[in-house]
């Protein structure tokens, strides 16, 4: 009855909550059939998605990579996707780009002309709430940096991209 009289009974949340998934997908200007340009595309998409992830102060625990051919062409069709679980929740561009490249290598099928690909970051959680794990695996000699070590680099990259644009 109060609502009919113009009195709000439920408060509206003006600011939307953080996204539960972040995606970056694109259709290509021309079909791609080789693995290397597909990897380049999804690693770029992962970087853009990582920037959005950091902007909302979240971490991803899974990354989905997909690609497909044109459903409007008479040739054979192919649509593939794979979910790559991340070892630790992260917003690190390098870790996400590597996961996207690994996913593309895993699902790539030669002989098809792909017109669209994309990356989706999933199972997002707030960056401030991170459950640590006991890490008993030795750090590889060539991989001494961790996502935590690169957080200042990611901040600098976001600032440069914001000032001068992406690309």
What is each residue range found by the language model?
Residues 80-81, 85-167:
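Acidic, metal-coordinating catalytic segment for phosphate/diphosphate chemistry
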Residues 1-111:
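DNA-contacting surface of Y-family translesion DNA polymerases
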């Amino acid at each position: 009855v109060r609502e009919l009289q113009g009195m709000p009974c439920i408060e509206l949340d003006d600011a939307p909550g953080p996204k539960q998934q972040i995606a970056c997908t694109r259709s290509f200007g021309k079909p791609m059939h080789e693995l290397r340009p597909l990897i380049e595309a999804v690693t770029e998409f992962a970087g853009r998605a990582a920037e959005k992830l950091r902007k909302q102060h979240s971490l991803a625990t899974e990354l989905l990579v997909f690609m497909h051919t044109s459903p409007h062409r008479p040739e054979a069709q192919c649509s593939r996707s794979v979910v790559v679980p991340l070892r630790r929740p992260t917003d690190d561009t390098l870790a996400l780009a590597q996961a996207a490249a690994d996913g593309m290598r895993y699902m790539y099928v030669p002989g098809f002309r792909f017109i669209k690909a994309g990356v989706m970051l999933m199972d997002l959680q707030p960056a401030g709430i991170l459950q640590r794990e006991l890490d008993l695996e030795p750090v590889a000699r060539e991989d001494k940096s961790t996502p935590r070590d690169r957080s200042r680099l990611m901040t600098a990259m976001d600032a440069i991209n914001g000032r001068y644009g992406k690309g």
